[in-house]
UniProtKB/Swiss-Prot annotation:
NCBIfam families: DnaA
Gene that this polypeptide is encoded by: dnaA
Family: Belongs to the DnaA family.
Spans annotated as Domain II: 82-117
Chief place of localization: cytoplasm
Organism superkingdom: Bacteria
Subunit and interaction comment: Oligomerizes as a right-handed, spiral filament on DNA at oriC.
Region called Domain I, interacts with DnaA modulators, residue ranges: 1-82
Stored Pfam families: Bac_DnaA (PF00308), Bac_DnaA_C (PF08299), DnaA_N (PF11638), Hda_lid (PF22688)
Binding, ATP: G163, G165, K166, T167
Disulfide bonds: none
Name of the protein in its database record: Chromosomal replication initiator protein DnaA
Swiss-Prot/TrEMBL domain comment: Domain I is involved in oligomerization and binding regulators, domain II is flexibile and of varying length in different bacteria, domain III forms the AAA+ region, while domain IV binds dsDNA.
Amino acid sequence: MNRNTSSLWADCLLQLQDQVPADKFQMWLRPLQADISSPNQLTIYVQNFFSRQWVENNYLADITKLARQLTGNPDFVVKLVEGVKPAPKQNNIVTTKQNAETAVDSEQHLQSVEFKTGLNSNHLFENFVEGKSNQLARAVGIKVANNPGDKTANPLFLYGGTGLGKTHLLHAVGNGILANNPKARVLYIHAERFVQEYVKATKLGAAENFKKFYRNLDALLIDDIQFFAGKELTQEEFFNTFNNLFEGEKQIILTSDRYPREIEKIEDRLKSRFSWGLSVAIEPPELETRVAILMKKAEERGVNLAEEVAFFIGQKLRTHVRELEGALNRVIANAEFTGKTITIDFVRDTLKDMLALQDKLVTIDNIQKVVAEYYRIKVSDLNSKNRSRSVARPRQLAMALAKELTNRSFPEIGKNFGGKDHTTVIYACDKIQELRETDSSIQEDWSNLIRTLSA
């Protein structure tokens, strides 16, 4: 493979992996092969007409844009061709022994990153922004990277809502394991891709090869394990693979959008094994972390983002990291296009549709309804003067959630809880913060409520 082809297509894939949902990336983009057929054209080979139509309709424009950016050639063309990439002729690729070795090294590197490990080398602990919402998960991830197979965190089960950094952390752990042991057999794979590979291997009579491959790994990292739901044969195979790896003290890391016991249509024996090691939640980032993420991402883009602007965006958008990054990308793109300075007013105008939607998503009324339903009490109880523990604690949680998830002031929140004084709201927020650090049941309730309200 031409060295330029290797680096160009690898760079395209790495950037697309951050832009395209993981399941879609694994299914449609990762398997594609490419070749530079001329100085101004990248040819991408697709399996069949259906694949060609799908890639053309959904991803070709983005791929072309990336290729032009990476080559600096505004006329660069990306062409889709049905079929298998032809084997290169040696004399068309290299003219000297040194160039041949470079081409082979490049090919081996691409295969190692994209097809053998599946890891994104850009996702590291160093650029994973840490905050209270993910502090424990990151610390455990580093521990696993330094000591894979330790039964105190094997399997490691990371769970939380979409866009909170689970996939980034999963790659960071895998890259950390490889940094400590470059010969380790580490594989990252999305659960849906695992299912597809197993079905394909079974149909082709290659089930034994499939088993041998997965059971000889040193670390298996599976993203979005909830995709195994309802797939009984895949669950059976994974159950046996899990046992084999665990008994061999090989590391298993799984992610899901929910706590292991909450995943529906997964066999109980698998759920039990998911809980053998350590399950760690990743929560929606608190304000300080949201601001830090925005500042970090802007710095990576070479953009000087004022802290007050980052605070404004962080206060307004409270759901997940992916939304923050999307908002920041829109702001930067608009600023580059218009030549304007990024100010709070500029951001307010650029993101007016997102901000309006966010204001509608979480209200104090919504919070009260969700909390009341969760604790099986009435909304009127939250607004009453009832000080019994069964009502007072949910009321404090609801007040703290209102402060976390809305832009309302302490007096405004108090007014919406039966006219409570703002000092009562401040006390409630401080109390819940204290209990979250000392009482695991309160932390679990908080996490469950945050996930429900952020869904």
